[in-house]
Amino acid sequence: MRRFSAATTLLLAAACAVHPRGEREERDRADAVARELDAEAPTLPDAPTLEDCLRVAFYANADLRARYWEWRAALERIPQEASPPNAVLSFSYLFGGPQMTAWDRTTLGIANEPGAMIPVPSKLATAGRRALEEARAAGLRFEAAKFGVQARVRTRYVDLALHAVMIEVQKESLDLLALAEGEAAARVRAGTAPMQELLAARSARDLAQSESESLHGQHATLAAEMNALLGRAADAPLPLPTAMPPSRELPGTDAEILALAGERSPEIAALSREVAGREEALELARAQRIPDFGLSFDVMGSATQSLGGMIVLPLRVEAIRGAIEEARASLRAAEAAREQARRDLAASFVLELYVLRNDERQAALFESVLLPRAELAARTAAATFAAGRGTASELVAARRTALDARLALAELRAQREKALVAIETSTKLDVEALHPVSLGDWRGR
């Protein structure tokens, strides 16, 4: 059996991969996500809340699953990169010649695959680490895609809620314009107003009616966009929300939020993993100076046993130098891309924080001062009109001012929520707890 020990060693070496440290943990994370994705998907209720839409989108969004499978594909490249070449078994049989047994006429051989030399283990380890960093980057991009889906669902839900407010405000405006038209018609009949006043009132009501119909038509477009995120048919019924989602507070100062941007951004983290992978690629290019080798072992019956080997001399000095410089340039490009991404993220954060704080200030002004004042003026005009001391035009003007203030407040709240979603997405923040949101936490939100 000892004559086959070398052959057995070659076979075992060919079957083993050099697994980098951290691969098992990355695979465990991917397996945990797979169990989440394969769980039974929740059903969307007839009148879904924002939380219902978020839960359904996690299971149904195809883009999120595509990112997951890209992550798994990157993980499966690790053993491919970190494995030695295949072994080749050869067989030959000698015909004719002196009297020999069948075994002595037989030659068995094992060698590395032709055209694929055996790299030293350090090369395989470096290649495995490079593939692991690429897999980690893919995993972080899945994380970014998860928060991207959450952001798109939140944004579209806010758009739907704002659309519901716009439809309600437009309906009340139509009622007011109908009242104004009725008063204008009465005044024309009484001879106290020209016909032009009635025509103007009718035109205003017709334009408002057309705008109302346009708003109802836009509902189908917004619903189709949300249905796409939820993995439903584009024309599946989706009612408008009954109210704007409650405002969520952003804890911490602006300086703290800006600091978190660079620390928790999944895109920056993915770029950092790509930089680490390029560093391993540079090490792999330098390792081309280390010769690869080949081994062979042959047994000719009971007559002879031979062990052979070969070595590849790294004489292509300029080619190796070029590969090293290419890897170094690629590393510098990845570092520059990461630095620019950090700068762009910081700039976008300054903008989003400005939008958020400015909308907060304006919303507070409308909520505490302008809207109550406009509603008080509308109630006063209504009381004056009921007492016969005011006109319908005055009532309509006062009430429409209150409706405009109500719509402006809803728009400010929607803009603030979108700015908060952008901050939340880039930093993986749970604004209620100010910590990274885990996958399980997000499912239950």
PLM features: residue spans?
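Bacterial Sec-pathway N-terminal export signals of envelope proteins
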Residues: 16-86, 234, 240-276, 339-342, ...
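Acidic, low-complexity, intrinsically disordered peripheral segments
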Residues: 17-21, 408-445
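Periplasmic alpha-helical coiled-coil/stalk elements that build and connect Gram-negative outer-membrane
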Residues: 18, 124, 140-260, 352-355, ...
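Small/polar, glycine/serine/threonine/aspartate-rich low-complexity segments that form flexible
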Residues: 40-45, 90-123, 127, 240-251, ...
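Amphipathic alpha-helical coiled-coil segments and their boundaries
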Residues: 53, 60, 67, 117, ...
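A glycine-/polar-enriched beta->alpha junction
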Residues: 56-66, 72-87, 100-101, 112-130, ...
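Sec-dependent bacterial lipoprotein signal peptides
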Residues: 1-14
